[in-house]
């Protein structure tokens, strides 16, 4: 699996327009694209626009990037600068509850964009820790949909988890604050 994460500053008063554009234009334009597993967007807690897409593999993402860029072009006027894109191969993950693509319920997403690993560790060590320690701890936690970790470089990556709501994520925050 391959994940592409985009963060962008949005012009004052344009966040709702940017989110509506993704929901009403970008996401529908991707219906039936081979290898695309999901697309979502939200307003991050730091005020930036955040969108992510998940793909069967990097090749599927690369094959559709032109269509993706065309679909996003209309959002350019709402942005206050050039978006920052981070992408990587998912090296660990766990789905706890299946959610239909037609689901109308919102959800809470938490992304952890790390600056790197501890000295002497690689992101493969992080993936092993997530798989063997964090994910089993989430097994009986209320409100979790799924979680994953993506490798960007040998010693750098990001992780994410999706919850029914902020309260569920906050209630389980002690589980996700374990460090290696």
Regions found by a protein language model. Give the residues of each.
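Short S/T/G/P-rich N-terminal loop/turn motif that feeds into the first structured element of a domain
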Residues: 1-50, 54-177
